[in-house]
Amino acid sequence: MITGIQITKAANDDLLNSFWLLDSEKGEARCLCAKGGFAEDDVVAVSKLGEIEYREIPVDVKPEVRVEGGQHLNVNVLRRETLLDAVEHPEKYPQLTIRVSGYAVRFNSLTPEQQRDVIARTFTESL
C-alpha cells in the first residue's frame, strides 16, 4: 500500500517537512520533495530515513496512461533503385513525391544531403 507522508520530526534536518510516498509492501520510500540530501524521485529503503515522525497526507492516485513522446511512421512505397536513379537523373522524376516528417515533398526539391539521408533512413538491411 502506498501512503503519502510529510516528515514532521527527524534527526536529519534535510528531512524536516519533506514529502514522501511510502510503499509498505516493498519497504521503500520515494522522495517527492526535500530541502537537501535527497533528489526528487529518489527511492530509498525506509530504514535510510532513520528515526522520523510524520503525518499522513491524502494521496489521490488514479490510473493514468502515460505516453512518452509519440510514434511516427512515414511510408514510402518505392524501390531504393528508383531514388538512386532520381538522384542521378532528376529530369526523369519531376513528380516523385515522398513523405518526410509527416509532410509530402518533391524528392528533387531536397538538397543532395537530404536525399542521401532519406535513402539511408528509408532502406535498411535489417532492423
Swiss-Prot record:
InterPro entries in the record: Auton_GlycylRad_Cofactor, Form_AcTrfase_GR_CS, Gly_radical, Glycyl_radical_cofactor_GrcA
Q: What residues does the Glycine radical domain cover?
A: 5-127
Which residues are annotated as modified residue Glycine radical in the UniProt record? 102
Q: Which UniProt keywords apply?
A: Organic radical
The reply on keyword Protein biosynthesis is no
**What does this gene product do?**
Acts as a radical domain for damaged PFL and possibly other radical proteins.
What protein name does the entry list? Autonomous glycyl radical cofactor
The cross-references to Pfam families, in alphabetical order and at most eight, read: Gly_radical
- Recorded GO terms, molecular function? formate C-acetyltransferase activity
Keyword Nucleotidyltransferase part of the UniProt annotation: no
Q: Which PROSITE patterns match?
A: GLY_RADICAL_1 (PS00850), GLY_RADICAL_2 (PS51149)
Q: Which GO terms describe its cellular component?
A: cytosol
